[in-house]
């Protein structure tokens, strides 16, 4: 099945594409260019970060965790976290509950095309 969801830039050098979602879960693919950074942020959803390829630093509540291909990390809701990308990286992120704001952005972008 072809994914019709658009690629959306989250911040410079970091894009995401919704892969699937349900009543209690949401999953997206993210591509991160080498040297890109996502500032510290937090959200109420739990998150599992899984590195498909590449290397990055996941900074959780001020502590850096270097992650490489095959690594996963669980983030509780409302925990401050950010990213510093060491090399081009692909990440599969899973959230619970869904990221409704991302789904709304996807829907708005599909209507424009």
Q: Residues of each region from the PLM?
A:
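Conserved short histidine dyad/triad with adjacent acidic residue
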Residues: 11, 28-42
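Anionic, Ser/Thr-rich low-complexity intrinsically disordered regions
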Residues: 30, 58-60, 92, 100-108, ...
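A cytosolic small-molecule/anion-sensing beta-strand core signal
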Residues: 52-53, 68-69, 87
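Short acidic-glycine-tyrosine-enriched beta hairpin
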Residues: 62-78
């Amino acid at each position: 099945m072809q994914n019709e969801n658009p690629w959306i830039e989250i911040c410079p050098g970091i894009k995401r594409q919704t892969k699937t979602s349900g009543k209690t879960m949401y999953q997206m693919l993210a591509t991160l260019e080498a040297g890109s950074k996502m500032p510290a942020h937090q959200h109420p959803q739990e998150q599992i970060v899984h590195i498909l390829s590449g290397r990055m630093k996941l900074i959780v509540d001020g502590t850096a965790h270097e992650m490489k291909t095959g690594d996963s990390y669980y983030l509780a809701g409302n925990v401050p976290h950010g990213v510093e990308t060491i090399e081009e990286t692909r990440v599969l992120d899973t959230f619970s509950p869904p990221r409704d704001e991302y789904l709304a952005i996807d829907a708005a972008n599909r209507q424009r095309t």
